[in-house]
């Protein structure tokens, strides 16, 4: 985790990547969802699919 002074809290590395990519290009709609996989982050849907796979 990295402490982010302006936000006043610590970010997990994944959250930091999402946070900074969001602010890098605020005019692009859907930028976060399209770039999340490039950072190796899982969407909520992907996490649910993974959990369902592990239960079987």
From Swiss-Prot:
Q: What is this protein called?
A: Uncharacterized protein YrzK
Q: Which domain of life is it from?
A: Bacteria
Q: Which organism is it from?
A: Bacillus subtilis (strain 168)
């Amino acid at each position: 985790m990295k402490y982010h002074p302006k936000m006043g809290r610590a970010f997990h590395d994944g959250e930091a990547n999402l946070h900074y990519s969001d602010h890098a290009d605020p005019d692009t709609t859907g930028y976060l969802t399209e770039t999340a996989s490039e950072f190796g982050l899982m969407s909520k849907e992907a996490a649910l699919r993974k959990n369902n796979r592990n239960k079987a």
